Amino acid sequence: MAHYFVGDVQGCFAELKRLLAEVDFNPSRDELWAVGDLVARGPDSLATLRYFQSLGDAGKTVLGNHDLHLLALHGKLKRDKPSDNLAPLLNAPDIASLIDWLRLQPLMRELPEHKVIMTHAGVPPQWSLDVLRQESQLVSQALKQSDYLEALISQMYSDTAERWDPSAIGLNRLRFCINALTRMRYLYVDGHLDFDCKQPPEDCNNPQLRPWFEFTSALRQSHTLVFGHWAALMGKVNDPKLKALDTGCCWGEYLTLWHLEKDQKITQKKLKKG
């Protein structure tokens, strides 16, 4: 059995299939773990979502910011942008089934026997594993409710929930978890989230900002953290316990697959149209 972790697919289904064929992925024996953002911008979000749904227990994904945005679009809470390439998905006959499957996906997954944790954007350095489990579970519980659109999705967009407050309750607590696990790149030196800078560290000109993974974290010392979201990193982080897998396939770069047991990365260049 092999565990394969894939970066932000974002509708780049042809590239995903190429990678899986190259490693002879077999869902009857192997598992495919995705760091989230299965949809948006790429040419075939519909096929991507259908494929992961079809994998059953052999497919494991977490929610990314684009996945959450899809929930908002389907709920008519946001307007679809042509650049997101989501019209075929939103108009698909099985969209309700796909949405119901997607909203049941968590914000974090772990592989305890390998001490691997996967989230979309990273893990706040202030959090222990117990806190990570607890906070992500609170969001999952909210997404499972029949009123999830009104109670959570319609109100999740907020740049004000940028500081971790263990005494926070209700929506503000959920907002911080969503912001941290699906949007985080940089933190200010005092530990609160920045939502603006997307450049790689060498190009960030704000001395008050540091990548989230440069802060001291007990969890990062004990576990391997697998994440995506930050395409500008192009997978380059100077720490063997960090696996940055977003390498910008939907922007014309690469889709990256990491084979856990071999600690090996395999890449597929964005395919040309036609």
State the predicted function of each range:
Residues 6-7, 33-36, 61-64, 119, ...:
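Active-site neighborhood of phospho(di)ester-bond hydrolases with catalytic His/Asp-centered motifs
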Residues 46-49, 54-170:
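Active-site neighborhood of divalent metal-dependent phosphoester bond hydrolases
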Residues 1-55:
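N-terminal active-site segment of His-dependent metallophosphoesterases
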Residues 133-274:
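Acidic, His/Gly-rich catalytic cores of divalent-metal-dependent hydrolytic chemistry
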Residues 2-5, 18-21, 42, 55, ...:
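Hydrophobic N-terminal alpha-helices or hydrophobic patches in metabolic proteins across all domains
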Residues 27-30, 56-58, 118, 222:
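A general structural motif
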